[in-house]
Amino acid sequence: MIRYLKKQKLLILETEQTSYWIGLKYPAPICLYWGAKIAPEDADMFEPIRDHSSFDMELWRERLEYPVFDGRTFESVSLKADVPLNLHTKHVDVREQQAEIVLEDEAGRLEVCLVYRVFEACDVIQKSAKITAKESVRLTRLDSGACLLPHETKPWTAHYVVGAWAGEFRRRTAKLEEGELRLQSVHGMSGPHMNPFLIAANGEDEGTGEAYGVALGWSGCWQITASSTVFGNQRITAGMNDADFIFLMQSDENFETPPMFLCMSGGGIGALSRKMHDFERWHLKAGRKPRRVLYNSWEATLFDVCAEEQMILAERAAKMGVELFVVDDGWFGARNSDKAGLGDWTVNPEKFPNGLEELIDHVHKLGMDFGLWVEPESVNPDSDLYRAHPDWIHRLADCEPMTQRNQYLLDFSKPEVEAFALDMLRGLLNTYQISYLKWDMNRAMTDVCECLTPFEREKHVLALYRILDTLGREFPDVDIEACSGGGARVDLGMAARTAQFWVSDNTDPFDRLFIQEGYTLMYAPMMMSCWVTDTPKDGHKRGRDDWHYKFHAAMCGTLGIGADISKLSDEEMELFSEEIARYKTWRDVVQNGDLYRLQLPSCSNVAAVEYVSKDQNEAVLFLFMHSRKYGEVFPRVKMHGLKEDTHYSCDETGKVYAGKTMMNLGLSVGLHGDFDSRVCHFQAVKLQQSKK
């Protein structure tokens, strides 16, 4: 709900459990309060913001909703032009779930419209800014917005993630003290070195204290800053990265920034994660339909793809219960390595002499859907596409363009390149019965200089969005998985347009526990594609040999198989079939339920992750042991989110336990050797009353 109290000059945004108050008494709107719900009738409890000294006048500016560079503000700003801007509130427009505050520059150069949307059930507020130029103006910073943390006696700690290829989503913390913490990407995509979200929390653990989350829906270069002043004002800003940022706006041109999402929880970081997971499932592309168990043939064949071998793999995949068969890189052009063929999106006639239809028909007859890997944004120098259009890549004048993984990046800011990519994808989806695309991007964006070509990086991302949006409208039944050499493009901008993410090329089950911990801080398990693979030989990830351990780690998200199943023994085939069948019985709990990170792999030799159905009648508990010293005794694992007076049967032990017992006394870990693991499925049961 949104209320505008004109007399008190207050705009109040309310969700089920939170309030966000915006004061309009000052020349520009300020954030008065964001936190647990408060009563509108108590508006007079806010004290005036006083000056401190002649060195620190107009301290209300530290609380601005959208601070701009005006020559008078000393803190970080959200908007900066080539001239100072003096914005004043012009009018406020309120609808049931959306509000707009229109600000006008005193000199009439531009207009800023702050847009707010509320998602009440998830306690999420979406913010963005629409900029309209009244005359030509040069922008060098353009954030989505700002928000303020409340003054608390407990200090705030920032929680965020860092990483690199094959080591994404490593959790980090930092105290928010005087100064500035800056998270960012300058690589042309949202990761993998950092990810566009920040959580400020003051609890002792995941289930206590308050937590405030900020996430940005943008898949290009971004920045999030958390700044703290000596007067106790702690502001978080988020938006497109202003490093080498230039946007030349013409008169009457308008632009809306990427959305910024705010979420607050009084139940700690864990509750905040669950709210964001609900938001992503209910309001973004993920939806709530079950994710299919897939098989991807990449690790079985690499580039040596051929129809006959793929059909054999498909038969074995179907036998073990796979629902979606995916052919990865190597099916097109002269693609026998990563050195050639990228960009030539026609089926290789030597590998598929009867066309791709033969394999697709075979897959469908086996009862599976068919999927395909694509990398539409890249091109090899050794390709027909590049030889025909060498001007279609990002490049600097008088400079040899840089290759990464033997490829260039196509310049999607050019309309003809965007049109080519869209037509190519339309052609594939219209020609073949494809229900899934894995969209990859295996390099950073280089050879871009915005002082020469303003807004080029951003135009690339906007073109990417237009293509994905068009495909979503024209092919609503096709799921797209976002991939960028692993988890370099996981963000809410892609989550609005793709069904799931490939979060890392590292499929080592132990490493994945850490990656999945960091990922689920902000993103839903339903969107997390997890594979069971062979123990790798290339050294970029360390394998754990036990298939059960590998399956249990991969079952914590959307299960996939990436192993070379042609080499599995009969016993291993049976094991795969049993584990896949078991996952299917409770995958809805994992994919649509509430997640509790009970014990973190970064803090304990035993990691524990629990998923609880929304009606609290079903739960799945995963336990993973890293190592154990001789005689070491582990504390019981206390479950969360169950009904106290309900009894639950456990499929692993065959016993029945009371919800209150499992939450208060806890369960014995029951793990023994290094890299041991367990999965326990609990279902509510009715106990028969004994006769007196």
Where do the protein language model's features map onto the residues?
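Glycan-recognition surfaces
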Residues: N380-A419, V461-S566
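C-terminal beta-strand-rich structural cap/linker in extracellular carbohydrate-active enzymes
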Residues: G659-K692
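Glycine-rich, aromatic-flanked loop segments that form ligand/cofactor-binding clefts
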Residues: E58-L85, E206-C221, C263-K285, V322-D329, ...
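Carbohydrate-binding surface patches
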Residues: L198, E206, L600-K643
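Aromatic-lined carbohydrate-binding/catalytic grooves of carbohydrate-active enzymes
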Residues: R288-D423, Y436
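Conserved, mostly hydrophobic/aromatic
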Residues: Q17, A129, D252, Y295, ...
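Short Pro-Gly-centered flexible turn/kink motifs
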Residues: F247-S265, S677-V685
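Polysaccharide-binding surfaces and accessory modules of carbohydrate-active proteins
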Residues: Y4, K9-I12, P29-S227, A243, ...
